[in-house]
């Protein structure tokens, strides 16, 4: 292939793609360009760094140099790509440019920070780099406010609480995990967080932040306020699409791709958190792994469509872990909930009594794979 494959990004998606390409072709030129150090780390570990007493550098599994040597790559770390000339098939940075035969965007997603006064005081934990920038403040903080009660917010709330910190979690919704499941299903974890000492401020809104002599004053609705030492935004991710937009690619929530992971330009593909696959943004490990396997084949000329099975999503809250699958967010499902001391099985069924979703917890997570087989594709 003329000029080989250029990949923008160095996270989980990019690395999975490299490994799958190299299983099939040991010599095709591969170039990776990324704004970070390109060291490998396990991103889900960020939800547990405080209770584990880990520093940012402790998360590194493989250095960029070791990665390059193992997989025969050209790496350009700490490099910001400024533009893509799709017609000329050239990627540009301020001081360099790279010709490509095929280009892959694996630019990930950035943490959304609510646009309130004082938003610059909010921290995010979406990368090793972001944790490195704030690890001292988080380790020293006694009082922590987490903004957002979704998957990451719930994981962080439990982790900081396990580390002995006073944790407050605020969310507009009436229950935690509101975008993933109904309150009658999430209530078991919500109760456990409360038992542990997490102060839940649900149906509440953060209105602003202000630095004080003794911490950060968070102003809430209904004339309430709370003083803390650190504020973490856990209000979701936004796919990184700016580069693709400047290149003239079709954008919706993410970079739009088809079942072959191909964008609106025949020579440009997208993978991972930045990609919107046939209308779906899937920022979870399993779909990224499966997508990387398919994309490697497609880049090497073995055109294969992506077919995603029903997949598990894991909520890593060690005191009460959950697995879920299917259309758990559907409003029209009837939930059949079986709760025992050792865990919960919640089944979401439609009007025809067909299983469409499930959530399992604790010791009953072992039932997940059996339930997974009964979900429709």
UniProtKB/Swiss-Prot annotation:
User: What cofactor requirement does the entry state?
Assistant: FAD
EC number(s) reported in the record: 1.18.1.-
A Pfam family the protein falls into: Rbx_binding
UniProt keyword annotation of Flavoprotein present: yes
TM regions (residue ranges): none
Q: In which pathway does it act?
A: Nitrogen metabolism; nitric oxide reduction
Q: What is its main location?
A: cytoplasm
State the InterPro entries in the record: FAD-bd_OxRdtase, FAD/NAD-bd_sf, FAD/NAD-binding_dom, NO_rdtase_NorW, Rbx-bd
Q: Which GO terms describe its cellular component?
A: cytoplasm
Q: Does the keyword Oxidoreductase apply?
A: yes
Name the Gene Ontology molecular function terms of this record. Answer: oxidoreductase activity, acting on iron-sulfur proteins as donors, NAD or NADP as acceptor
- Per the record, the coiled-coil ranges are none
Q: Cellular location of this protein?
A: Cytoplasm
Report the protein's function: One of at least two accessory proteins for anaerobic nitric oxide (NO) reductase. Reduces the rubredoxin moiety of NO reductase.
Which family does the record claim for this protein? Belongs to the FAD-dependent oxidoreductase family.
PANTHER family per the record?
A: NITRITE REDUCTASE [NAD(P)H] (PTHR43429:SF3), PYRIDINE NUCLEOTIDE-DISULFIDE OXIDOREDUCTASE DOMAIN-CONTAINING (PTHR43429)
Its protein name is: Nitric oxide reductase FlRd-NAD(+) reductase
Lineage start: Bacteria, Pseudomonadati, Pseudomonadota, Gammaproteobacteria, Enterobacterales
